[in-house]
Amino acid sequence: MRKREISLATGYLAAPFIREAKGYERHIDICWDAPEKDGLKYYKIYRSTDGRDFEPIGISRSWMRRYTDFIGTVGQRAWYRVSEVGYDLKESPLSEAVEAATRPMTDGELLDMVQEAQFRYYWDGAEPASGLARENIPGRGDMIAAGASGFGIMATIVGIDRGFVTRAEGVERFLKITSFLERADRFHGAYAHFMDGPTGKVETFFGGKDNGADLVETSFLFQGLLAARQYFDGDSQEEALIRSRIDRLWKEVEWSWFKQHDDSPYLYWHWSPDQHWVINHPLIGWNETMITYMLAIMSPTHGVAPGMYYSGWASQEKMAHDYRAGWGMTEDGSAYKNGNTYYGIKLDVGVSNGGPLFFTHYSFLGLDPHKVTDRYTNYFVNNRNIALINHRYCMQNQGGYAGYGYDCWGLTASDDAWTYHAREPQPYHDNGTMAPTGALASFPYTPSESMAALKNYYRNYGSFLWGEYGFRDAFNLSANWVSPLYMGLNQGPVVVMIENYRTGLIWDLFMSHPDVKRGLEALDAIR
């Protein structure tokens, strides 16, 4: 966040207006209106259980006009008041009191609750100049992430469709987003991993070599944009403008440039305007990058031959074999196809025993795995089996980690108590850290196991795991640790994949795009 002069004058502090208090099964959300003030340090929240005697229970940062009170029981009534506190620690008068109560909720209502809370990460928590997603909250306030923004675009479509915000509000947000994307830095049509929200300039967060295009992050972004292009199908000038902007941006991505040279069998992850291919990272599956090859094949202007799916993504070359064996630490799946059985589940495709669960999420938020079948497998079946292997590994709990079981599972990438790590169902990639997105973004594959995890995380761990933007990024009961962050790459897949499980909305939108249809037909022709 940019530094600014802070006024210590607090004479203008005033009681906020609480516009809503809403009870859920185990918590109550309150939100209020108050103008921005330089001298404001935080909001102070008070609660009463009798409507008369109020005690302070917490604070909310000056930019957050919402507070989640996790009560932990059903049928509890509470009253709330809020004040403003300045940098000199003087306090405004308290707001008028509002009341709400926790209540029993159906499974459908619990899904609504999770989707709406995690949607707010991208709506209330968006970087204001661009309307796009921050890498994490709290974090670097002006820095946005292209991939997380693509996930947020799809989550926002869900939010509009479910009435969390109006369509008119959604149109306004997407006009801001597409306007920003038109003026942001691009490199042969592709975006950087990180950008500055106010200026659109590259943020070299991962170092000076990563100062240009990131083709994988661009793919996640365009997976969302193509779904949005299909969603905003109205006759208004505003919706037509959204469509035309997305069409133009889509056609300007030079996917074929990222082959590095004309006879390359691979696409490459990065390109730098002054260091060119210095990172030199070819895209080889099985991992999260299938969508990159798919979009490159689908492009109507700068596409690659459909055969690159097999020469690059599913390559049988020695380099690809060594790449897979190296990161997987095994020969299993090093030829792309696997064929082994783990915990009683046969795995057609995947390195080791399937890898982290985000491999089954990121490429398949818009791309419907039911409708993707290659020479080796159908990807809904394969993704479901990867999720089931992950679930059974966690039930077996070889490491003896606290909490693991039928309703606590889903090893994937997240922060942990020590670093950021992509965890998977292997002892050497497991340290007891669980990210809620693992199980919850797997709803289409494992609805019963995912619902069990949702209820466990909310009902039993919600006092430390649930907050204003839904579930926090990760927790480790053995290490007595919970992440202080919400992460843009992990909040969105939960919203989107729950919706795909419930209605297939985002799958249907993305798959309806004419270029998507044409690209998949071209792939089917060489299967």
Predicted regions and their residues:
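Proline-enriched interdomain boundary motifs that mark the N-terminal boundary
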Residues: 10-19
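Short S/T/G- and acidic-enriched coil/turn segments that sit immediately N-terminal to beta-strands
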Residues: 63-68
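Ser/Thr/Asn(+Pro)-rich, low-complexity disordered segments
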Residues: 99-527
